[in-house]
Amino acid sequence: MQKIQFILGILAAASSSATLAYDGKITFNGKVVDQTCSVTTESKNLTVKLPTVSANSLASSGKVVGLTPFTILLEGCNTPAVTGAQNVNAYFEPNANTDYTTGNLTNTASSGASNVQIQLLNADGVKAIKLGQAAAAQSVDTVAINDANVTLRYNAQYYATGVATAGDVTSTVNYTIAYQ
């Protein structure tokens, strides 16, 4: 009897796999390029000092103030003909400070200002960078690799999520250099 149950079990297992059928196929494509640029020493760990502003200037949700430019300097960039990469930008990595709803950085200062975040923007100071998104959806402008040195220009500003209160504002974000 045990022999029959064993054989029936084997037959059942074999026949169940025969009923599986593929519903589709996924193909993955990518490209690996030489690292075409190096971040300069002074750009590796930046500190961007935002201006001191009045809490009144951030009196309601969506208000922004204190637009402050910053740059990431790259050196030793190879030409696109050598590497296959023609453009470069910073990809701002999501972390514990990322507000996935607004796409901004939350304030991590102890006893800091409330209802205040830090918003990153492209060089134009208008188009917001949406943190917490995939690279293509972050809306980060790319820069052509035309020279051995490339400057990536961005901006940061205060962003109100409600009526702001006074206090310090601090946050951090890591970045990776991405090539296209």
Curated annotation (Swiss-Prot):
One of its GO terms (biological process) is cell adhesion involved in single-species biofilm formation. GO terms for cellular component: pilus. Keywords: Disulfide bond, Fimbrium, Signal. It comes from the Bacteria. Gene3D superfamilies: Fimbrial-type adhesion domain (2.60.40.1090). Its main location: other. Coiled coil: none annotated. Residues 1-21 form the signal peptide. Disulfide bonds join 37-77. It is found in: Fimbrium. InterPro entries: Adhesion_dom_fimbrial_sf, Adhesion_dom_sf, Bact_Fimbrial_Adh_Pro, FimA-like. Fimbriae (also called pili), polar filaments radiating from the surface of the bacterium to a length of 0.5-1.5 micrometers and numbering 100-300 per cell, enable bacteria to colonize the epithelium of specific host organs. Belongs to the fimbrial protein family. This is F17 fimbrial protein. The lineage of its organism: Bacteria, Pseudomonadati, Pseudomonadota, Gammaproteobacteria, Enterobacterales. The gene is F17a-A.
